[in-house]
Amino acid sequence: MIRRLNHHEIDFEKYSGCIEKSVQKNMYARREILDFWCESWDILVWKDYEYVMPLPLTKKFSQKFVTCPIFCQQLGIFGKNDSSEINERFLSYMQANLDIYLYSFNAGNHFQRDLSFRKNYFIPCGTYADQKKKFSKGRKSAIKSATGLDFQQITLNSVILEFIKRFYKGLSKEKDKKMMLDYLQFLHGKEMIKVCSASLNGELRTVALMGDDGETLYLIGLVSDEKFRNENPTSFIIDQILQDNLENRNFSFMGSNVRNIEIFNKSFGAELMKYPVIQHSKKEVLIQFLKNKLS
């Protein structure tokens, strides 16, 4: 029932149709996003594209490994509904036939066995007034204290890119930072990005960078000049984004397992949505690679 299709064998019209109609639909599984991030990618398919599972691949030691790229938070199995039985078949096929370093399923995938999980916080589309009732007292206070700040939706321009280069802290490797900046410009070209700013007297305090697929905003980065932290620009900007967008967009914080960030996300009344992951250490991957070579 499950077949692996190499990239050149994929019927992309059927693949994209399955993703668009799926109950697990997200931005990360779109063809153009995977084409940008992946060295190469294949898929597993159930019957005639009733369910699909993208496989991002990278090559190390002359061997291809499955590993999810940066900013592709949740891939997994996509279809007309979620079936733990079908999900198990995909997982068993994957484990038996592929070398896996890191693979993240989506929050809509459920299994009959225990897997590790990572955290995401998510706010479903609805009224801002109802959502604000769920804000923590501390977050409401921080928003109230953020007086005098100016909120704007802006374009991704050279000033914003320079601000990101100076203050973005989420990535330690320079090559990853460059890829992130390239990704932002790629999304800009596809009209799939929303950029918002909080400033005081024309001076930037915080910039929010979000992927936008027409249904959900995905928080790629919240970039701040830390010397203005006491002005609470991050609380202010998220609140403004929710006010302007929540009636027609879901909002995904894209994380986080980091405690301080988790508390921040949760304080806006966001729902915890765990997604299953398979991850092996580099040592485990190397051992498996050597076993395959010797077998």
Where are these regions (language model features)?
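Acyltransferase donor/substrate-recognition loop-hinge adjacent to the catalytic core
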Residues: 1-7, 110-174, 292
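N-terminal charged segments
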Residues: 1, 6-64, 169, 173-188, ...
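Short catalytic-loop micro-motif centered on adjacent basic/acidic residues
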Residues: 102, 152, 250-254
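Short, conserved active-site entrance elements at the starts or edges of catalytic domains
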Residues: 154-206
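Conserved donor-binding loop and adjoining core beta-sheet/short helix segment
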Residues: 17, 31-87, 200-226
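Alpha-helical membrane-targeting segments
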Residues: 60-68, 203, 279-295
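Non-catalytic accessory segments adjacent to catalytic cores
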Residues: 84-120
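Aromatic (often tryptophan-rich) hydrophobic motifs at membrane interfaces
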Residues: 89, 192-288
